[in-house]
Protein backbone atom coordinates (compact mmCIF):
# COMPACT_ATOMS: atom_id res chain seq x y z
CA UNK A 1 0.00 0.00 0.00
CA UNK A 2 2.95 2.31 0.71
CA UNK A 3 4.13 1.97 -2.91
CA UNK A 4 0.73 2.93 -4.34
CA UNK A 5 0.94 6.64 -3.49
CA UNK A 6 4.27 7.34 -5.32
CA UNK A 7 3.15 5.27 -8.29
CA UNK A 8 -0.18 7.10 -8.51
CA UNK A 9 1.53 10.50 -8.08
CA UNK A 10 4.01 9.68 -10.84
CA UNK A 11 1.20 8.48 -13.09
CA UNK A 12 -0.86 11.65 -12.58
CA UNK A 13 2.20 13.89 -13.04
CA UNK A 14 3.18 12.18 -16.31
CA UNK A 15 -0.45 12.19 -17.48
CA UNK A 16 -0.60 15.94 -16.91
CA UNK A 17 2.71 16.56 -18.70
CA UNK A 18 2.25 14.21 -21.67
CA UNK A 19 -1.51 14.57 -22.01
CA UNK A 20 -1.86 18.28 -21.34
CA UNK A 21 1.22 20.48 -21.10
CA UNK A 22 3.24 18.94 -23.95
CA UNK A 23 0.40 18.90 -26.55
CA UNK A 24 -0.67 22.45 -25.66
CA UNK A 25 2.92 23.71 -25.79
CA UNK A 26 3.70 22.10 -29.16
CA UNK A 27 0.40 23.33 -30.62
CA UNK A 28 1.07 26.88 -29.41
CA UNK A 29 4.65 26.87 -30.73
CA UNK A 30 3.51 25.43 -34.07
CA UNK A 31 0.84 28.10 -34.43
CA UNK A 32 3.32 30.81 -33.47
CA UNK A 33 6.31 29.76 -35.61
CA UNK A 34 4.63 27.94 -38.50
CA UNK A 35 0.95 28.95 -38.69
CA UNK A 36 0.48 28.05 -42.37
CA UNK A 37 2.08 24.61 -41.99
CA UNK A 38 0.40 23.89 -38.65
CA UNK A 39 -2.99 24.46 -40.25
CA UNK A 40 -2.45 22.03 -43.13
CA UNK A 41 -0.67 24.23 -45.70
CA UNK A 42 -4.02 24.91 -47.33
CA UNK A 43 -4.08 26.57 -50.75
CA UNK A 44 -6.92 29.08 -50.82
CA UNK A 45 -8.53 31.12 -53.54
CA UNK A 46 -10.61 33.69 -51.74
CA UNK A 47 -12.72 31.80 -49.22
CA UNK A 48 -12.41 28.49 -51.08
CA UNK A 49 -9.87 25.84 -50.12
CA UNK A 50 -8.50 24.34 -53.36
CA UNK A 51 -6.18 21.80 -51.78
CA UNK A 52 -3.12 21.36 -49.63
CA UNK A 53 0.45 22.00 -50.67
CA UNK A 54 1.36 18.76 -48.86
CA UNK A 55 -1.09 16.24 -50.36
CA UNK A 56 -1.47 15.38 -54.03
CA UNK A 57 -4.77 15.44 -55.87
CA UNK A 58 -6.14 13.17 -58.56
CA UNK A 59 -5.71 15.21 -61.76
CA UNK A 60 -6.77 12.95 -64.62
CA UNK A 61 -7.69 15.15 -67.58
CA UNK A 62 -5.34 15.68 -70.51
CA UNK A 63 -5.17 19.38 -69.67
CA UNK A 64 -3.49 18.71 -66.32
CA UNK A 65 -0.08 17.51 -65.26
CA UNK A 66 -0.36 14.13 -63.57
CA UNK A 67 1.46 13.28 -60.35
CA UNK A 68 2.69 10.01 -58.96
CA UNK A 69 0.21 7.14 -58.73
CA UNK A 70 -1.72 7.10 -55.49
CA UNK A 71 -1.47 4.05 -53.28
CA UNK A 72 -5.00 4.69 -52.03
CA UNK A 73 -6.59 3.22 -55.15
CA UNK A 74 -10.28 3.18 -54.14
CA UNK A 75 -10.24 6.93 -53.48
CA UNK A 76 -6.98 8.40 -54.83
CA UNK A 77 -4.97 10.63 -52.49
CA UNK A 78 -7.15 9.80 -49.47
CA UNK A 79 -5.01 10.69 -46.42
CA UNK A 80 -7.07 8.42 -44.17
CA UNK A 81 -5.93 5.40 -46.19
CA UNK A 82 -2.27 6.41 -46.37
CA UNK A 83 0.39 3.83 -45.72
CA UNK A 84 3.17 1.79 -47.23
CA UNK A 85 2.36 1.14 -50.84
CA UNK A 86 5.22 -0.17 -52.90
CA UNK A 87 5.51 -3.86 -53.56
CA UNK A 88 8.89 -5.55 -53.35
CA UNK A 89 11.03 -5.34 -56.48
CA UNK A 90 10.89 -9.14 -56.67
CA UNK A 91 7.07 -9.18 -56.68
CA UNK A 92 5.64 -9.99 -60.15
CA UNK A 93 2.56 -7.87 -59.32
CA UNK A 94 4.79 -4.77 -59.28
CA UNK A 95 5.95 -5.56 -62.82
CA UNK A 96 2.32 -5.87 -63.96
CA UNK A 97 1.33 -2.58 -62.31
CA UNK A 98 4.29 -0.70 -63.80
CA UNK A 99 3.69 -2.18 -67.26
CA UNK A 100 0.02 -1.14 -67.11
CA UNK A 101 0.93 2.37 -65.94
CA UNK A 102 3.60 2.76 -68.64
CA UNK A 103 1.11 1.64 -71.31
CA UNK A 104 -1.53 4.08 -70.05
CA UNK A 105 0.95 6.96 -69.92
CA UNK A 106 2.28 6.15 -73.40
CA UNK A 107 -1.29 6.11 -74.75
CA UNK A 108 -2.11 9.44 -73.08
CA UNK A 109 1.23 11.01 -74.11
CA UNK A 110 1.90 9.76 -77.66
CA UNK A 111 4.08 12.79 -78.47
CA UNK A 112 6.50 12.21 -75.59
CA UNK A 113 9.86 11.30 -77.07
CA UNK A 114 11.74 9.80 -74.12
CA UNK A 115 11.02 6.94 -71.75
CA UNK A 116 8.38 7.39 -69.06
CA UNK A 117 9.87 8.98 -65.90
CA UNK A 118 10.02 6.48 -63.06
CA UNK A 119 8.07 8.61 -60.57
CA UNK A 120 5.05 8.61 -62.88
CA UNK A 121 4.75 4.83 -62.59
CA UNK A 122 5.76 4.16 -58.96
CA UNK A 123 3.78 5.26 -55.92
CA UNK A 124 5.50 7.10 -53.10
CA UNK A 125 5.83 5.56 -49.64
CA UNK A 126 2.76 7.41 -48.37
CA UNK A 127 0.83 7.20 -51.63
CA UNK A 128 -0.03 10.90 -51.26
CA UNK A 129 3.02 12.56 -52.82
CA UNK A 130 2.32 15.90 -54.48
CA UNK A 131 5.75 16.44 -56.04
CA UNK A 132 7.42 15.20 -59.19
CA UNK A 133 10.67 16.25 -60.81
CA UNK A 134 10.68 19.07 -63.36
CA UNK A 135 11.77 16.45 -65.93
CA UNK A 136 8.64 14.37 -65.25
CA UNK A 137 6.50 17.49 -65.63
CA UNK A 138 8.33 18.44 -68.85
CA UNK A 139 7.70 14.95 -70.23
CA UNK A 140 3.94 15.71 -70.07
CA UNK A 141 4.18 19.11 -71.81
CA UNK A 142 3.09 17.95 -75.32
CA UNK A 143 -0.17 16.46 -73.97
CA UNK A 144 -1.01 19.45 -71.77
CA UNK A 145 -0.05 21.96 -74.49
CA UNK A 146 -2.34 20.25 -77.00
CA UNK A 147 -5.27 19.97 -74.57
CA UNK A 148 -5.04 23.59 -73.39
CA UNK A 149 -3.88 25.13 -76.66
CA UNK A 150 -0.77 26.57 -74.99
CA UNK A 151 2.77 26.75 -76.29
CA UNK A 152 5.56 24.49 -75.10
CA UNK A 153 7.45 27.62 -74.04
CA UNK A 154 4.56 28.82 -71.82
CA UNK A 155 4.40 25.48 -70.04
CA UNK A 156 8.19 25.25 -69.70
CA UNK A 157 8.20 28.67 -68.03
CA UNK A 158 5.33 27.66 -65.74
CA UNK A 159 7.19 24.52 -64.66
CA UNK A 160 10.32 26.58 -63.99
CA UNK A 161 8.29 29.07 -61.96
CA UNK A 162 6.79 26.36 -59.73
CA UNK A 163 9.97 24.29 -59.38
CA UNK A 164 11.42 24.23 -55.87
CA UNK A 165 15.12 23.72 -55.26
CA UNK A 166 16.31 21.52 -52.37
CA UNK A 167 17.28 23.32 -49.15
CA UNK A 168 20.83 22.01 -49.42
CA UNK A 169 22.22 22.16 -52.95
CA UNK A 170 23.61 18.63 -53.25
CA UNK A 171 21.07 16.84 -51.07
CA UNK A 172 17.80 16.12 -52.80
CA UNK A 173 16.55 17.19 -56.19
CA UNK A 174 14.35 19.94 -57.57
CA UNK A 175 10.62 19.18 -57.46
CA UNK A 176 7.41 20.63 -58.85
CA UNK A 177 4.28 20.75 -56.70
CA UNK A 178 1.61 19.31 -59.01
CA UNK A 179 -1.30 20.86 -57.10
CA UNK A 180 0.15 24.37 -57.34
CA UNK A 181 1.19 23.85 -60.98
CA UNK A 182 -2.29 22.70 -62.04
CA UNK A 183 -4.00 25.50 -60.14
CA UNK A 184 -1.71 27.95 -61.97
CA UNK A 185 -2.78 26.31 -65.25
CA UNK A 186 -6.42 26.92 -64.37
CA UNK A 187 -5.64 30.58 -63.66
CA UNK A 188 -4.17 30.92 -67.17
CA UNK A 189 -7.60 30.03 -68.58
CA UNK A 190 -9.35 32.78 -66.62
Curated annotation (Swiss-Prot):
Bilayer-spanning residue ranges: 10-30
InterPro entries documented for this protein: KdpC
Topology relative to the membrane: Single-pass membrane protein
Domain of life: Bacteria
Molecular function terms, GO-annotated: ATP binding; P-type potassium transmembrane transporter activity
Keyword list, A-Z: ATP-binding, Cell inner membrane, Cell membrane, Ion transport, Membrane, Nucleotide-binding, Potassium, Potassium transport, Transmembrane, Transmembrane helix, Transport
Pfam families attached to this UniProt entry: KdpC
Subunit structure and binding partners: The system is composed of three essential subunits: KdpA, KdpB and KdpC.
Similarity section: Belongs to the KdpC family.
Functional description taken from the UniProt entry: Part of the high-affinity ATP-driven potassium transport (or Kdp) system, which catalyzes the hydrolysis of ATP coupled with the electrogenic transport of potassium into the cytoplasm. This subunit acts as a catalytic chaperone that increases the ATP-binding affinity of the ATP-hydrolyzing subunit KdpB by the formation of a transient KdpB/KdpC/ATP ternary complex.
Protein name: Potassium-transporting ATPase KdpC subunit
Gene behind the chain: kdpC
Amino acid sequence: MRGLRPALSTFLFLLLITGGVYPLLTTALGQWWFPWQANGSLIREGDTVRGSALIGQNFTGNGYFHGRPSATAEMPYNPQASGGSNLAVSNPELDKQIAARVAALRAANPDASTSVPVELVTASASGLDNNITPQAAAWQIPRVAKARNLSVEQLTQLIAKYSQQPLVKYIGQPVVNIVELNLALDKLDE
